[in-house]
Amino acid sequence: MRVAVAVCFVLLACASPSYTADQEPAVTVLVAYHSLSGNTEKMAREVATGAKAVLGTRVVLKRVGEVTGPDLFSSDALIVGSPVYWSNMAGEVKTFFDNWQLKFGVFPEFKMRNKVGAAFTTGGQVSSGKELTMLTILAAMLGNQMIVVSGGGAFGASATTEGDSPGVDEKEAASARELGKRVAEVAGVVKRGSVK
């Protein structure tokens, strides 16, 4: 009898989810970025900090070239950051999106469908193409049937990093944190069906 009870407990433990009845499943936010100067990486870290501020959020922070298929498909949300190169996303970020099909096989099932997506950028000048860059990132997400959100700004978060505004200032960092927080909140609503 004791053996039968022990076996039942083991089976129940293996079959139950990794959270208790009063806990919600964690939301996983993947923050993927490309950075040469360190400015976009700083924004990525701020985005991650904002997402972590939402209770029950797990954050994975990686350069776009390090992201694996399991990273992508196990996430509930994806926030992509790029420096502005010629008023567009960096080639490494474009390759990341191209690899969704070439390496990870997202089609024809639309494996990113209904995941939450957002964008952030850094650019040297005030009108260097930051909004356009965010829109190209968001367009790639929309093409994959993701749910895109903003936060911190109309299209995401951005920083001007040259001239009279070198690096990422506190206002820009706060905008990045707000983006991360909003994405984590929306991902929680999508995953759980309600606001916590």
Description of each model-found segment:
Residues 65-151:
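Helix-loop-strand module that forms the ligand-binding subsite of alpha/beta enzymes
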Residues 27-51:
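N-terminal beta1-alpha1 ligand-phosphate binding loop
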Residues 56-66:
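A short beta-strand-loop structural module common to alpha/beta enzyme folds
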Residues 18-20:
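Boundary at the C-terminal end of the N-terminal hydrophobic targeting segment
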Residues 24, 28, 68, 149-196:
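Glycine-rich phosphate/pyrophosphate-binding loop and the adjoining helix
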Residues 4-13:
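Bacterial N-terminal signal peptides
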Residues 45-57, 142-143:
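Short helix-loop-beta junction
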